[in-house]
């Protein structure tokens, strides 16, 4: 079993890491979730029947681990919202984006923000299809969806992404117009003052 596990690790670790990282967008959390994936693999490898590829099986486990984590986060968030007195406390988000997400290209940041607007299934399909380059058939096998569900989920996810990207671009254009107006006013003041 040790040799088999090592082979699985060597062969698929990077794919699993990328999949989970794009889901949770945090290096430390990704590593924690990977540990959970590997524990589940060790505990259930004897039940693997080979009806799908090992990669498909591993990605399915990773997806379930991510879903469990998101559910747990939602429960924690609801508990906090229910017990915290928001009217009397100064609340600020102290959490910064991980270094891995401080990507230079603005479009990549916009896509990350837009992915947060998608459901877990939409996010998983988009990550597998467009970031990891899976075909519709491979995505269906990995997520244990029908091909039509992959297509529908992909279509809906892309629609959410497109809408969110348009909103972000509108905000950026509004900001640029405001900056131009301020700059124009500053130029007028400095030239009229001489």
Curated annotation (Swiss-Prot):
Its function? Answer: Sigma factors are initiation factors that promote the attachment of RNA polymerase (RNAP) to specific initiation sites and are then released. May be involved in the regulation of iron metabolism. Associates with RNAP core during early growth phases, association decreases as cells age.
Question: Which Gene3D superfamilies does its entry note?
Answer: 1.10.1740.10, Winged helix-like DNA-binding domain superfamily/Winged helix DNA-binding domain
Among NCBIfam families, the record links this protein to: PRK09639.1-1 (NF007217), sigma70-ECF (TIGR02937)
User: What does the record give as the organism's lineage?
Assistant: Bacteria, Bacillati, Bacillota, Bacilli, Bacillales
Q: What happens when the gene is disrupted?
A: No effect on antibiotic resistance; double sigM-sigX mutants have 130-fold increases sensitivity to the beta-lactam antibiotic cefuroxime. Association with RNAP core increases during many stresses (at protein level).
Domain of life of the source? Bacteria
By sequence similarity, the record places it as follows:
Belongs to the sigma-70 factor family. ECF subfamily.
- By its UniProt entry, which Pfam families does this protein fall under? Sigma70_r2 (PF04542), Sigma70_r4_2 (PF08281)
Q: Which organism is it from?
A: Bacillus subtilis (strain 168)
In Swiss-Prot or TrEMBL terms, this protein is called ECF RNA polymerase sigma factor SigX
- What biological-process GO terms show up in the record? DNA-templated transcription initiation; regulation of DNA-templated transcription; response to stress
PROSITE patterns per record: SIGMA70_ECF
Sorted keywords for this record are: Cell membrane, DNA-binding, Membrane, Sigma factor, Transcription, Transcription regulation
Q: How does it assemble?
A: Interacts transiently with the RNAP core.
Localization annotation: Cell membrane
Gene Ontology CC: plasma membrane
């Amino acid at each position: 079993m040790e040799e088999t596990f090592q082979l699985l690790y060597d062969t698929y670790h990077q794919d699993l890491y990328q999949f989970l990282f794009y889901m949770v967008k945090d290096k430390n959390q990704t590593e924690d979730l990977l540990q959970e994936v590997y524990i589940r693999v060790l505990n259930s490898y004897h039940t693997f029947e080979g009806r799908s590829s090992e990669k498909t099986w591993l990605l399915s486990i990773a997806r379930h681990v991510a879903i469990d984590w998101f559910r747990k986060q939602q429960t924690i968030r609801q508990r906090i919202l229910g017990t915290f007195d928001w009217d009397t406390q100064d609340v600020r988000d102290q959490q910064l984006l991980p270094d891995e997400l401080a990507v230079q290209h603005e479009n990549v940041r916009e896509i990350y923000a837009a992915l947060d607007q998608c459901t877990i299934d939409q996010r998983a399909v988009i990550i597998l299809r467009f970031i990891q380059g899976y075909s519709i058939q491979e995505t269906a096998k990995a997520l244990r969806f029908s091909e039509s569900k992959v297509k529908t989920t992909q279509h809906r996810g892309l629609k959410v992404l497109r809408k969110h990207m348009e909103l972000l671009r509108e905000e950026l254009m509004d900001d640029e117009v405001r900056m131009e107006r301020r700059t124009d006013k500053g130029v007028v003041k400095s030239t009229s003052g001489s």
